[in-house]
């Protein structure tokens, strides 16, 4: 048996085993997943929002980011905070809101290293927070959206 044949056999075996391992990893909730489920509501949705946010920011897709946000939202991308009432305003002010530093924090964030507490899942050093929001008073229906966007370099301790 040649090295090429042995290598091909190993690749074939690895190819059949890898999807099983990936499926097991995706269905087995981690401690982080459980923490997100308790604090925010649904770790799968948080992971989706993080991925969608990263893709939309990479494409400079203001509308793609705007649909992920809970309104109204108070944003603080610099020295003076302001309130965005809806998606239309967000799209108009996108370049003021998603600054280079905020975009950089979004790009660098890995799902596995999210910080989670009762406020939600934190991206970067708090530049963006993904949070659960009740749709009604009984909170039987909820949404998971971006609830905070801020430049943490300008925040006072």
Q: Which stretches of residues belong to each language-model region?
A:
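Bacterial N-terminal signal peptides that target proteins for export
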Residues: 1-10
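Bacterial N-terminal signal peptides
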Residues: 9-19
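C-terminal-biased regions
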Residues: 25-55, 66-157
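Sec/Tat signal peptide C-region and signal peptidase I cleavage site
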Residues: 20-24
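Charged, alpha-helical scaffolding/interaction elements associated with membrane systems
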Residues: 58-59
């Amino acid at each position: 048996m040649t090295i090429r044949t042995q290598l091909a056999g190993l690749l074939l075996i690895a190819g059949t085993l890898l999807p099983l391992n990936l499926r097991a990893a995706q269905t087995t909730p981690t401690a982080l997943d459980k923490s997100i489920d308790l604090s925010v509501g649904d770790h799968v949705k948080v992971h989706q929002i993080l991925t969608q946010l990263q893709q939309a920011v990479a494409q400079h897709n203001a509308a793609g980011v705007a649909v992920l946000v809970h309104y109204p939202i108070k944003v603080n991308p610099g020295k003076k905070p302001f309130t965005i009432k809806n998606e239309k305003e967000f799209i108009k002010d996108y370049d003021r809101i998603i600054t280079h530093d905020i975009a950089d924090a979004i790009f660098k964030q890995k799902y596995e290293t999210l910080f989670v507490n009762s406020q939600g899942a934190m991206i970067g050093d708090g530049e963006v927070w993904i949070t659960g929001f009740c749709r009604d008073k009984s909170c039987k229906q909820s949404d998971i959206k971006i609830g905070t966007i801020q430049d943490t370099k300008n925040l006072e301790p």
